[in-house]
């Protein structure tokens, strides 16, 4: 009987379904030390954070552990230093002085346990620092060592000791890597300029390149802020691409340029004489050239040229006509003056008469003004150049001022008051307005017609009317009114502060009019005691310093004071000699603090021109046509002799 395949046995009915529960997916890593049968209750994370209170013993243990770890780390660092840092006594590039001692006495150095501290010595130049570049350090040391021994000029100062092994290693490196040890021009300049005294090094290199000293071409400016139009520039380490375009770069800011280029181991070296359109100081020129040449400012020498040196002018002239220079613009006058024969012959002789004539024509009578103004004419006047080349400048200035004062004084004394006012009016070009003066007099309650009458007598020096006194309270414009009048008339000012001297009245000898400002009580007493004859306008003697007494007639005198002498009986003898005007009202000002009445010289010019007939200073019709007199000339003319 066949088997009942696929049928259920006895006691079973239907299908039996079985479902598997999968806890781990395919590819999931299962830890070997993890018990898969134990259920995760979360109790294994209970003691992960220790929240028990910290006791004193545990804190000491932690501090001890930290200290032990720090000591271990420090010891490890020291071991690394001993392992990888070389001895400073072995490498001649690290410590030259001690390496020299090792070479001199190697046996003594071998038994030395410790190095004795050495005293610090001052050196003229600092030894350039040998930096550690990390990779390829041996080649850098060998290259630096060989170039120092090969260059004739050492900027470090002092010998360089080396041991036998170091020399052999250097020679081996040079022979093996000769192609990789060539420095560019920029690198050579940077190494050389590590010296402390950069300027001295640049001056030496300049002399080697050009064959003359840089100081022969320049004059030194101590201040970097002093301005000048001409500058001599020497630049080192310029790239060749910049040198080709330098002429075009400076052309917009210059009127003249003289450029020379030389090539040496550093690169391109520039020597230029430049005249700028606007005067510049050294700082401005250095920034400008550093930008155009693409080099640091301390790689340049910048000074003004020596304009009074014939040798310097001849150098620029001779080099300018050669093919080694690039010259653009008009040659400076100081070069032309010293290189052309005619100019050289004209500068030899100084004539004092020409200097006096110039001072007279320009109204210079003070020594300081004459010296300063005449020295500035050296560029255009041959006699001024000869004056600067003279060793007697102070004597010439003193003589010129003395002669000019004599001529001016004689010219003034030759004129009467009418001619003098006309002469003073010609000094001012503007016409002005006479009305502010009249309005100011009305503001002070001064009758205009009586004022003109008394002013007329004062100008002509009428006896007993030769002195005008303006009195009144302070701040009424007394000094302003009188000072403006005296300034227009070219008068002098005397002060009672010098009354202790016998010569305080000496300025009256050479004056057309005079002013005595702010007369006090003691001054009125002095005038009442000693100056009655002077106030009368009569001749009197004046004591002069280092000279004999001078017999003069006192010029018209105007005084200001806060004291009214008419109200005091003791000054009754002065009242008949002094004409009084009272200014009772304060001087008016506008909101901006400006004077409401303009009492200037041009307004006084218009005042005297307008009222010339009332003041009896009008000119005749013949004089209106012009002055027929010849102008003063202290320079001898040339006599033309006919055959």
UniProtKB/Swiss-Prot annotation:
GO terms for biological process: DNA replication. PROSITE patterns: SF3_HELICASE_1. The keyword Hydrolase applies. Residues 130-166 are annotated as: Disordered. Belongs to the papillomaviridae E1 protein family. Its EC number is 5.6.2.4. Residues 181-347 are annotated as: DNA-binding region. It comes from Human papillomavirus 44. This is Replication protein E1. It catalyses: Couples ATP hydrolysis with the unwinding of duplex DNA by translocating in the 3'-5' direction; ATP + H2O = ADP + phosphate + H(+). One of its GO terms (molecular function) is DNA helicase activity. The keyword Isomerase applies. Phosphorylated. Sumoylated. It is found in: Host nucleus. GO terms for cellular component: host cell nucleus. ATP-dependent DNA 3'-5' helicase required for initiation of viral DNA replication. It forms a complex with the viral E2 protein. The E1-E2 complex binds to the replication origin which contains binding sites for both proteins. During the initial step, a dimer of E1 interacts with a dimer of protein E2 leading to a complex that binds the viral origin of replication with high specificity. Then, a second dimer of E1 displaces the E2 dimer in an ATP-dependent manner to form the E1 tetramer.
